[in-house]
C-alpha cells in the first residue's frame, strides 16, 4: 500500500508542499496513530510504501522560513537555489527556483551534503518509528543522481529489503533503475499504451511497447527489471473515464495483471470509479470515500490478483508476443517451470486465432476449465484468458 501522509501539516498542494518531514498531516491524525496503522497492516502481511517528496518543500518549511527572516544571515540559504539580486513572485526580497515554475514548491539543493544528511535522517526516523518498507520518490526524474545513490546505500544498510520506486514519465528508465539507485519506477510508456490501444482498437501499440521493454531480442531494454505498472493514478484521468468503451475496463486490467511489472491499483478504481483530470486541478481524481463500494469488477480483480500471486510465470516470466491483431493480443509469460498464455479479445465479435505455438493441454485459470489446443484458440467477445500449460 502506497501512502502520502508525512510532512504536510495544513498544506495547500495535496501534501506535496512539505513543512515538516517528521510530522504526519494533522488532518489525518498523529504519528502515534500512523504507527498503529502500520503495525496493523504489517500483521495482515501488507507492506507500506511512503511518498518521499525530496525534490522540493513548501514555503512554510522551517528552513525556508529562516531564509525569509534572515536572508544572507541564514545558515540554510544554501539549502535552496537562491539569488539575492532578484525577487520572487511573493516579494520575498530574493529569487528562488520553484519546481517546474511552481513557486509554492521550493526546490531543494540536493547537492548540498547538509540537505541530503537531513533527508536521510528523516528517512531513518520513518523506518524506526513506523517500520515502513519502501519509498515512492516523487518526481524522481528531477532528483540528483548522487542523492539517489546515497539514499539506496543508506536504506540498504537500515533495512535490506527496503524498496525505492521512482516517479518517472518517459525517457530511459535504466538511468535511475539500476543496482546503484532505484529498484523500480513508474512505467508511463505502457500506461499510455494500455488505454490508447483500446481506444484506438490497435493492440499493436501495447504489444510493441511490451516487446520493446521486455522481449527476448538483444535491443529490448528492460529485461529483468520489474517496473511499476498501472492503469491510472492520482495524476491522470481514471481508467473508467478515459476508456471509450466500458467493456474494455476488464480487458485493460487483464493485460495489466498478465504483463511484466509490479501492478498497482489506484484506490476506487477497483470498483470502476470515474474521475476526469481538470486543466487546473486534480480534485476529481482524489475523492474521499466513506466506505468501499465493491462490485463484480472488484471480485474479478481480486481473482486475477490471486492468480498472479500464485504464478511464477506471471510474476517473473519472460515476455513473448504470439498473436497480434488490431483487436486481439496473445502473449506468453514463461519461466523454467511454468508457461502461461495471456489472451485478450477487445472486440464485440468472437475471434479464432491460429498459430503454431497454440498447442497443448492446459488450464484456463480464470474459469478453471481444462482445454486442449491444436494450433488454434477461440476468443469470446470482450474476453480475457490466462492459460497455463
Listing of model-derived features with the role each one plays in the protein:
Residues 1-7, 12:
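Single conserved hydrophobic/aromatic residue that forms the stacking wall/gate
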Residues 44, 62-105, 193-216:
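Core domains of carbohydrate- and sulfate-ester-processing enzymes
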Residues 13-19, 54-93, 179-189, 280-284:
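Aromatic- and acidic-residue-enriched segments that line the glycan-binding/catalytic groove
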Residues 8, 16-47, 245-247, 295:
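Aromatic- and glycine-enriched glycan-recognition loops and surfaces
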Residues 48-50, 135, 164-166, 229, ...:
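Hydrophobic faces of well-ordered beta-strands that scaffold small-molecule active sites
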Residues 128, 138-221, 255, 274-303, ...:
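Active-site-proximal helices and loops of the catalytic beta/alpha 8
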Residues 15-30, 101-116, 133-142, 197, ...:
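The substrate-binding groove and active-site-proximal loops of carbohydrate-active enzymes
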Amino acid at each position: 500500500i502506497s501512502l502520502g501522509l508525512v510532512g504536510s501539516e495544513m498544506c495547500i498542494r495535496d501534501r506535496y508542499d512539505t513543512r515538516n518531514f517528521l510530522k504526519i498531516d494533522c488532518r489525518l491524525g498523529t504519528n502515534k496513530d500512523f504507527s498503529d496503522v502500520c503495525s496493523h497492516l504489517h500483521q495482515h502481511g501488507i507492506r507500506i510504501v511512503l511518498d518521499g517528496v525530496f525534490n522540493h518543500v513548501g514555503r512554510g518549511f522551517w528552513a525556508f522560513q529562516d531564509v525569509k527572516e534572515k536572508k544572507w544571515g541564514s545558515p540554510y540559504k544554501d539549502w535552496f537555489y537562491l539569488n539575492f539580486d532578484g525577487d520572487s513572485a511573493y516579494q520575498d526580497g530574493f529569487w528562488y527556483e520553484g519546481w517546474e515554475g511552481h513557486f509554492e514548491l521550493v526546490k531543494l539543493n540536493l547537492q548540498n551534503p547538509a540537505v541530503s544528511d537531513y533527508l536521510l535522517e528523516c528517512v531513518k526516523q520513518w523506518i524506526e518509528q513506523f517500520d515502513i518498507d519502501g519509498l515512492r520518490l516523487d518526481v524522481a526524474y528531477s532528483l540528483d543522481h548522487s542523492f539517489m545513490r546515497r539514499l539506496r546505500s543508506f536504506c540498504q544498510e537500515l533495512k535490506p529489503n527496503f524498496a525505492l520506486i521512482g516517479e518517472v514519465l518517459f525517457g530511459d528508465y535504466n538511468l535511475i533503475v539500476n543496482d546503484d539507485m532505484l529498484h523500480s519506477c513508474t512505467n508511463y510508456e505502457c500506461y499510455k499504451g494500455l488505454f490508447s490501444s483500446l481506444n484506438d482498437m490497435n493492440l499493436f501499440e501495447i504489444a510493441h511497447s511490451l516487446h520493446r521493454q521486455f522481449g527476448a531480442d538483444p535491443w529490448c531494454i528492460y529485461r529483468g527489471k520489474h517496473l511499476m505498472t498501472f492503469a491510472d493514478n492520482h495524476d491522470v484521468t481514471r481508467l473508467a473515464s478515459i476508456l471509450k468503451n466500458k467493456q474494455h475496463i476488464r480487458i485493460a486490467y487483464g493485460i495489466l495483471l498478465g504483463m511484466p511489472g509490479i501492478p498497482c491499483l489506484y484506490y476506487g478504481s477497483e470498483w470502476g470509479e470515474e474521475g476526469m483530470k481538470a486543466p487546473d486541478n486534480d480534485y476529481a481524481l482524489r475523492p474521499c470515500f466513506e466506505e468501499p463500494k465493491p462490485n463484480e469488477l472488484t471480485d474479478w480483480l481480486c481473482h486475477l490478483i490471486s492468480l498472479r500471486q500464485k504464478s511464477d510465470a506471471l510474476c517473473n516470466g519472460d515476455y513473448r508476443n504470439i498473436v497480434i491483431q488490431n483487436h486481439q493480443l496473445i502473449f506468453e509469460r514463461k519461466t523454467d517451470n511454468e508457461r502461461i498464455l495471456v489472451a485478450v479479445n477487445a472486440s464485440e465479435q468472437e475471434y479464432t486465432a491460429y498459430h503454431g505455438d497454440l498447442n497443448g493441454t492446459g488450464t484456463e485459470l480464470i474459469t478453471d476449465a481444462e482445454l486442449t489446443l491444436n494450433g488454434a484458440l477461440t476468443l469470446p467477445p470482450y474476453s480475457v484468458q490466462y492459460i497455463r500449460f
